[in-house]
């Protein structure tokens, strides 16, 4: 509970220990006084108790002392709050987007990942966004948590991890049917390992864009699409093995005739490139029968190159 895996942990542990210790001392003192007074002023010892109409010193003491303690709690917490809300200007900036029901991490060079990769002993600032409802980005090991609210800019959290390893990320705000499955991981690695990972993933992004724009994918565009489906959180709702999740499975869907509900009317459509693209950009227009219209629009969130890569991946799952 008091592990020191990040700089923010110090700002949380200190006030918690102070408040807990103070409360414990007060609990013991008040309980001891109650027990003492119970015996000391028992009816058998004081058959005719004296009425006390006021005691100015006592009233001042039990007003002033708790007030000082309350201000002490506030001051201690305020110092930590100021620190938590003051990231260093050279912190590594990463955009984090929450959506039902996955996280996406976007780096400055365009790399996207469903899991967070950061270097050890370096300040990291996570700029939080939400595509749909309120989510909350929570890393228990580092004692950091911040809500991501739709259409509210400027939300962030920052920290500096002190130890390499893999840590859990959770959504700490109930966000619907698969809220409990909205978790991810933080990979804390050395600076060299982080730079290598970022360069490698950046090369994949450049390759995907080039292949999609030229139309010559060398047979590898579906591989890039597979990685993209994970980073975009597609696989949180669409399985690749035929099993039913929140949305239709990708397996065997390309070229299939599906029954969809359009403006309240059922009709037949063939799943092709145009249908897949339209379903990404305007997912509530044609709802596959038997499913709910839960998918948010990806318009402005996926590029033409990414749509082509995702389509190639879906095609490959026959």
Residue positions per predicted region:
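Extracellular/periplasmic metallocenter environments
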Residues: 90, 148-214, 235
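Beta-strand cores of secreted/periplasmic/IMS beta-sandwich domains, seen most often
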Residues: 17-40, 54-137, 154-170
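Residue-level "contact hotspot" at macromolecular interaction interfaces
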Residues: 117, 148, 160-161, 221, ...
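Membrane interface segments of multi-pass transport proteins and intramembrane proteases
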Residues: 47-52
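Gly/Gly-Pro-rich "capping" loops immediately C-terminal to redox-active cysteine motifs
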Residues: 160, 183-191, 226, 236-282, ...
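C-terminal capping alpha-helices of c-type cytochrome domains
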Residues: 195-201, 206, 293-318
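Electrostatic cytochrome c docking/interface patches
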Residues: 110-112, 195-230, 269-270
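Hydrophobic alpha-helical segments
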Residues: 1-25
């Amino acid at each position: 509970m008091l592990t020191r895996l990040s700089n923010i942990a110090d700002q949380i542990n200190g006030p918690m220990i102070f408040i807990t210790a103070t409360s414990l001392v007060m609990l013991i003192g008040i309980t001891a006084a109650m027990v003492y007074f119970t015996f000391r002023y028992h009816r058998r010892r004081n058959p005719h108790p004296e009425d006390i109409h006021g005691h100015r010193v006592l009233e001042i003491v039990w007003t002033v002392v708790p007030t000082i303690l309350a201000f002490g709690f506030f001051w201690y917490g305020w110092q930590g709050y100021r620190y938590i809300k003051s990231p260093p200007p050279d912190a590594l900036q990463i955009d984090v987007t929450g959506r039902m029901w996955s996280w996406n991490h976007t780096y400055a060079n365009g790399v996207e990942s469903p899991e967070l990769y950061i270097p050890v002993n370096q300040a990291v600032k996570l700029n939080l966004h939400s595509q749909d409802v309120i989510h909350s980005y929570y890393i228990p090991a580092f004692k950091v948590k911040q809500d991501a609210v739709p259409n509210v800019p400027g939300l962030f959290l920052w920290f500096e991890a002190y130890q390499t390893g893999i840590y859990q990320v959770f959504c700490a705000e109930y966000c619907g049917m698969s809220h409990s499955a909205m978790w991810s991981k933080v990979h804390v690695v050395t600076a060299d390992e982080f730079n290598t990972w970022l360069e490698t993933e950046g090369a994949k992004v450049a390759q995907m864009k080039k292949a999609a724009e030229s139309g010559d994918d060398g047979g590898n565009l579906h591989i890039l699409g597979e990685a993209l489906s994970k980073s975009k959180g597609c696989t949180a709702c669409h399985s690749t093995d035929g099993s039913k999740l929140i949305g239709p499975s990708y397996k065997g869907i390309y070229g299939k005739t599906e029954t969809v509900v359009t403006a309240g009317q059922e009709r037949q459509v063939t799943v092709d490139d145009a249908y897949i693209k339209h379903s990404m950009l305007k997912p509530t227009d044609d709802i596959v029968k038997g499913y709910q219209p839960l998918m948010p629009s990806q318009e402005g969130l996926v590029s033409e190159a990414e749509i082509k890569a995702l389509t190639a991946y879906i095609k490959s799952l026959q």
